[in-house]
């Protein structure tokens, strides 16, 4: 299987407000940049969209390393989702899971791949995540024009 590295980020001007997502995919010396935007939305929805759209861009099953500065995404997909699914998309205190539509989409998008999730501190000079951040901000700008 091909190895792919994904750097993802989301941005929101106001929360909720206009938002954008960005992702950089790196594989075999090739790079692809993706971005988009929505309004109104939240930063967490944009963080999720970045990863979902990056995974949807992969044409075949891959070994994937995903770098995100969102602990919400990293912990949600690695730890919390198992309980949510077991409880019918409810939290431990029986409330509906926020952004369940996107968590379900991410759960589906990750299925064909072998994924390792990595959390990186945001705005800390990590080149891949800085690029993803710039793309997310382009996503915000794309809906403000």
UniProtKB/Swiss-Prot annotation:
Positions that bind Mg(2+) 1: 9, 47, 69
GO cellular component terms, A-Z: cytoplasm
Sorted UniProt keywords: Cytoplasm, Endonuclease, Hydrolase, Magnesium, Metal-binding, Nuclease
Domain RNase H type-1: 1-141
InterPro entries per record: RNase_H, RNaseH-like_sf, RNaseH_domain, RNaseH_sf, RNaseHI
A GO biological-process term: DNA replication, removal of RNA primer
Subunit annotation: Monomer.
Job of this protein: Endonuclease that specifically degrades the RNA of RNA-DNA hybrids.
Family: Belongs to the RNase H family.
Name under which the protein is recorded: Ribonuclease H
Species name: Cupriavidus metallidurans (strain ATCC 43123 / DSM 2839 / NBRC 102507 / CH34)
């Amino acid at each position: 299987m091909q190895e792919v590295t994904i750097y993802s980020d989301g941005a929101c001007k106001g929360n909720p407000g206009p938002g954008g997502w960005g992702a950089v995919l790196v594989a075999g010396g090739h790079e692809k940049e993706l971005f988009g935007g929505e309004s109104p939305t939240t930063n967490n929805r944009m963080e999720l969209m970045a990863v979902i759209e990056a995974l949807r861009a992969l044409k075949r099953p891959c070994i994937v390393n995903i770098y995100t500065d969102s602990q919400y995404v990293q912990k949600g997909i690695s730890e919390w989702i198992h309980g949510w699914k077991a409880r019918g998309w409810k939290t431990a205190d029986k409330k509906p899971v926020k952004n369940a539509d996107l968590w379900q989409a991410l759960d589906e998008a990750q299925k064909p791949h072998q994924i390792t999730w990595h959390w990186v501190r945001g705005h800390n000079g990590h080149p891949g995540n800085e690029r993803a951040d710039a793309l997310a901000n382009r996503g915000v700008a794309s809906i403000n024009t």
